[in-house]
Amino acid sequence: MKLTWILVADNVHVRIFTVDTPSSALEEIEGFTHTESRLHDREMTTDLPGRIKSDGGSGHALEQKTDPKKHEADNFAHYIARYLEAAYNSNKYEQLLIIAEPTFLGLLRNCLAKNILKQVCFDLDKNITQHSAADIRKHLPEYLTNH
């Protein structure tokens, strides 16, 4: 059986599991927490949006160009993508299964290198990072085949 990693993720947590045989239980081998994604918007930015006055004397609030939470989720997705590429290049896995919160799954897909995307043999848009390994296993194909 190919070396298989199962990545379970959201914008705050990533858990990586492996399996010994195609039908065996999951074994957690790595975990990451991105605490910045837990912060409130006001804690992520140094300044509040400003205000401008128009000719009529009324003011208008200026909006931030980017959403701080989305920015942090994107940073985390890039970090995980780089980690997955380095691990693949070090022959730590040969095929990858991904279960991720829908928005984070989209961010992660956009960050993954083409050679890593080719190794993805299963993905599911579901947020189950807080579930037990046994419960996560139930969301995967019963028999993990070689990609």
Task: Please identify what each model-predicted range represents.
Residues 1-147:
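Terminal alpha-helical anchor/extension segments at protein ends
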